[in-house]
Every structure is written in structure tokens, then in C-alpha cells.
């Protein structure tokens, strides 16, 4: 089917950026939010963003004006979706809220409209249960900020029509994004599945008293990272990684719920930059990070082994192909390389030994070597020769 009209539901950080991308791509867009103040703020932010694009030469002044003319704003769901070919849900990451939006949108949209969710973690098959036509529901996971990040993960639910996946991927390309098609639905998809294991690791480093946030962030920067993990948690909001781990503790493994430090900080409303305090003091608008030597209690190999383990899980579960896992991690995390290319330079034995050490040290099954690595088949997995496990998560 041909996509001409796009409705974006939710005018927050993700929604307004997604609307901008579609408008610049030549689509007629309606941005919907039930809160008028959110729509007013979104309009200002889109105009400012397009002005920056003009200044950087990404679009001409005329192209920016044309894009703005293609965006309409409404607080009425019916007005937004009644003539839409594609509806993109971009409301906050709550199962109940997203299911409510998908139910209403699918009831009011044309029968053949594609209903896409921008969820970052929630299984599409779970969300699609709320829709009138589950076969028209697909995951379309943009990364933040969508105007800068090129990756879009395209996720089929158990009932999704293959043509819906294909059309969603084609539309992603037309707005200048790089779509990665998952082979099947799985919690947190690719990039965030790998990020979640890293997040759990950094929480447990604090739980075990191994190092402090400044020491770990100093270590991260010594390894060439622009921002350490705790500064990043503060910057995006500590509730974001915690919500992800909380969902995965229910959908994938209770082990993700071991992130007690993140949970406590969310309970105490110490969310980072947006509340003024998290792992660091943000009262001046930027993190006040004490200068300390890097910790030597963790290593780059710890993180590489964890990433490789999660990548191999995705492959053996039949969620994604090795090349797509690599590309998703590189594009989704702005990294110079991904776990597949790293694994090619390491032996199965050294990765297995490191994972066994981490699983014991942190008393965490997430870090235990996955089946393929335990059986010495890491190379088969990363080179695409591994048959997916029949009983893997879906």
C-alpha cells in the first residue's frame, strides 16, 4: 500500500521529532496529543529544530517552510487518524497507556491503516491484543532523538501481516532512517536488549560496592566513551533504564529486577538532570562529577563479553541475524563497532570464561554464558550457521 497521510499520537520528545521526519519526507502529518500545551510546545520545538537544519544545510529554507505547512495539530484522536494510512503511537512507555491508544486508534482509523508502536521494550504481540486488527500492528522503534538517530527497529508481532512489516521498513527508508527488520518479536528487541544487560551490570557494580559512579564514569571516558554510564543515566532520566529493567524482569527474566539501586533512586525521585539530582548534582544544569582516577575493578572485557552474550542469545533465539544485530548496536548506540565484530577477534573459551566469572561474581544468571557459547558454538552463531533454538523466548 502507498503511505501518504501519517498520524503521530503523542507530542512529547519522540512524537514531535517523528512528526518532523515525516513532514520533511513529504508526508502529510497530523500530530495528536490530548494536552494542548504539549502541542504548543511541540510546534515551537519543530520550528526551532528545522531552523537548525537550515543553518546546518540539511534542508533549505523553502524545504523547511514546506515541511511546517504539512503538519497539522489536534487533540482529537478521530480527527488525527480517520484518514491516516499510517498511525505512529509515541506515548510514554506504559503497557496500559499504549494499549489504550492502540485500541482507540485502530477503532477510528481506516481498516487498512498500519498501526505502528514506537515502544522501546514492550512486545508487539502483547500490544497488538488491544487492536481491532492485530495483523495491521507493527513495531516501529525510533531512537532518541529521532531527528538525529538513524536506526529504526521494525518488529513483527505474532499476527502481523508480512506486507505491513515491508511497508513500514520502506517508509523508514523514505524518511532517511535505516530500518532493521527483526525476524520475530522479543522484549526490548535488539539494541535495548543488549543495553539492558549493561545497565544491570552497572547497577550491580554499585550494589556490590565494587566502585563508585565517578570511578566508573572515569573508567568509561578513559576507554574513549564520551559519557560514562551513570552520567548518561542521569542525563536521560534514571526512570527510563529502570522502567526497561522492570518490564524485562516480568517479560524475560526476574534477574533484571536485581537493579536495586536504580529502583531505590526512582522511588526517591532522584531521577537525574530533570529533578536536579541523581547519581550527581545537576543544580547548575550540568553534572557535578568529582575528578577521580578510573577504577581498575572492572574491565572493558567485562562489557564486551556481556554484549557478545546478549547478541548470541538474540541469534540463537531466532530474533535477528548476526549482521542486523551488529548494525542495530552500532546505529542505536552511536558506537564504532558492535558485538559481532568484537566476537570475531576473541575465542569462545575466553568469552565463556569471562561470562562464568561475571555470573559468579555478581550472582546473576543474565551474565552466564548462553547455550551456544557453553557448547563452543559462538563462531557458528556470529557467522550465521547456528539453527535457532526451538524453545527460545518469543
Language model features with spans:
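N-terminal glycine-rich phosphate-binding loop for ADP-containing cofactors
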Residues: 1-394
Amino acid at each position: 500500500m502507498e503511505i501518504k497521510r501519517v498520524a503521530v499520537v503523542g507530542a512529547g520528545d519522540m512524537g514531535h521529532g517523528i512528526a518532523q521526519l515525516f513532514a520533511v519526507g513529504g508526508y502529510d502529518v497530523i500530530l495528536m496529543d490530548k494536552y494542548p500545551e504539549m502541542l504548543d510546545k511541540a510546534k515551537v520545538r519543530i520550528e526551532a529544530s528545522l531552523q537548525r537544519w537550515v543553518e546546518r544545510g540539511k534542508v533549505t529554507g523553502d524545504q523547511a517552510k514546506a515541511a511546517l505547512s504539512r503538519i497539522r495539530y489536534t487533540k482529537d484522536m478521530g480527527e488525527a487518524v480517520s484518514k491516516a494510512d499510517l498511525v505512529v503511537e509515541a506515548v510514554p512507555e506504559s503497557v496500559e497507556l499504549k494499549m489504550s491508544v492502540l485500541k482507540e486508534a485502530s477503532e477510528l482509523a481506516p481498516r487498512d491503516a498500519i498501526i505502528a508502536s514506537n515502544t522501546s521494550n514492550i512486545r508487539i504481540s502483547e500490544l497488538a491484543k488491544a487492536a481491532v486488527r492485530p495483523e495491521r500492528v507493527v513495531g516501529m522503534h525510533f531512537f532518541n532523538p529521532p531527528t538525529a538517530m538513524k536506526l529504526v527497529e521494525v518488529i513483527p508481532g505474532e499476527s502481523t501481516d508480512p506486507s505491513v512489516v515491508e511497508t513500514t521498513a520502506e517508509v523508514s527508508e523514505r524518511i532517511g532512517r535505516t530500518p532493521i527488520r527483526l525476524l520475530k518479536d522479543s522484549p526490548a528487541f535488539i539494541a535495548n536488549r543488549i543495553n539492558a544487560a549493561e545497565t544491570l551490570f552497572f547497577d550491580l557494580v554499585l550494589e556490590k560496592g565494587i566502585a563508585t559512579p565517578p570511578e566508573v564514569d572515569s573508567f568509561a571516558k578513559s576507554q574513549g566513551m564520551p559519557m560514562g554510564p551513570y552520567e548518561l543515566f542521569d542525563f536521560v532520566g534514571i526512570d527510563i533504564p529502570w522502567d526497561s529493567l522492570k518490564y524485562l524482569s516480568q517479560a524475560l527474566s526476574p534477574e533484571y529486577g536485581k537493579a536495586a539501586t536504580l529502583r531505590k533512586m526512582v522511588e526517591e525521585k532522584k531521577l537525574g538532570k530533570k529533578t536536579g539530582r541523581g547519581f550527581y548534582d545537576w543544580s547548575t544544569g550540568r553534572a557535578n562529577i568529582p575528578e577521580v582516577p578510573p577504577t581498575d575493578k572492572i574491565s572493558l572485557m567485562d562489557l564486551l563479553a556481556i554484549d557478545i552474550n546478549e547478541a548470541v542469545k538474540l541469534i540463537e533465539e531466532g530474533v535477528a541475524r548476526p549482521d542486523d544485530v551488529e548494525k542495530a548496536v552500532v546505529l542505536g548506540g552511536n558506537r564504532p563497532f558492535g558485538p559481532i565484530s568484537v566476537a570475531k577477534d576473541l575465542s569462545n573459551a575466553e568469552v565463556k570464561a569471562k561470562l562464568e566469572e561475571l555470573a559468579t561474581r555478581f550472582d546473576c544468571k543474565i551474565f552466564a554464558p548462553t547455550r551456544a557459547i557453553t557448547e563452543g558454538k559462538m563462531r557458528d552463531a556470529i557467522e550465521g550457521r547456528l539453527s535457532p533454538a526451538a524453545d527460545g523466548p518469543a
